Amino acid sequence: MAMITRNTATRLPLLLQSQRAVAAASVSHLHTSLPALSPSTSPTSYTRPGPPSTSPPPPGLSKAAEFVISKVDDLMNWARTGSIWPMTFGLACCAVEMMHTGAARYDLDRFGIIFRPSPRQSDCMIVAGTLTNKMAPALRKVYDQMPEPRWVISMGSCANGGGYYHYSYSVVRGCDRIVPVDIYVPGCPPTAEALLYGLLQLQKKINRRKDFLHWWNK
C-alpha cells in the first residue's frame, strides 16, 4: 500500500505536466484570426448628397457677347457675299461661257461680282477648262498668291475630273488634286446659268461662315 501511494505521488506531477504541454500545444495550433472580407464582398459606402450648389456658373460667353459676335459675323459675311472678286483662269472652251456670264444679259456686276486680273486682288478663282500637267504648277502658284479667305469654283467636266480628256497622259484628272475646290459646276461646257447658280451657291456658303466667333473662342 505504501508502494502504490509512493508511485502515485511521483507520477502524478509528471502526468499533470504532460497534460499541460499537450493543452498548450493544441491551443497554439488553433486558428484564432478573424476572417477578412474580400474587396468584392466589402459593403459600399453611401454618402448622403449635400444641398444644391449655389456657386456661379463657369465663365463663358454671355448672351450679350454672343449676340454681338454673331452680328459681327453677319456683317462680315454680308460684305463678302456682296463683293466677290473672281480671278479668271480660263483654260478651254468653258472660258467662253464664263465671259458670257459677265456680259450684259446676265450682268454679274449687279451681284457685286467683278472679274479681277490679279490674284492679289481676288478672293475667288474660277478654273474653267482642261488643266494640263504643265499648267498645274502655275495654277497652284496663282492660288497661293490670293489672300485669305479664298474660294475656288471648278467649272466644267474637264476641270471637275478630266472630262473628255480623262485618260490623256498630259491632263490632270480634276483641279481638286492641285487646289481645294468649294463649288463644282457640271457641264461640257456648262451654260452661263449654271455658272451663275454656282456663284449664288458660293454666296450661301460664305454666309454660313463664323470667322469672328472661331477667333474669339481661341
Swiss-Prot record:
One of its GO terms (molecular function) is 4 iron, 4 sulfur cluster binding. InterPro entries: NADH_UbQ_OxRdtase-like_20kDa, NADH_UQ_OxRdtase_20Kd_su. It catalyses: a ubiquinone + NADH + 5 H(+)(in) = a ubiquinol + NAD(+) + 4 H(+)(out). It comes from the Eukaryota. Its main location: mitochondrion. Binds 1 [4Fe-4S] cluster. Residues 34-61 are annotated as: Disordered. Its EC number is 7.1.1.2. PROSITE patterns: COMPLEX1_20K. Complex I is composed of at least 49 different subunits. This is a component of the iron-sulfur (IP) fragment of the enzyme. Belongs to the complex I 20 kDa subunit family. This is NADH dehydrogenase [ubiquinone] iron-sulfur protein 7, mitochondrial. It comes from Arabidopsis thaliana (Mouse-ear cress).
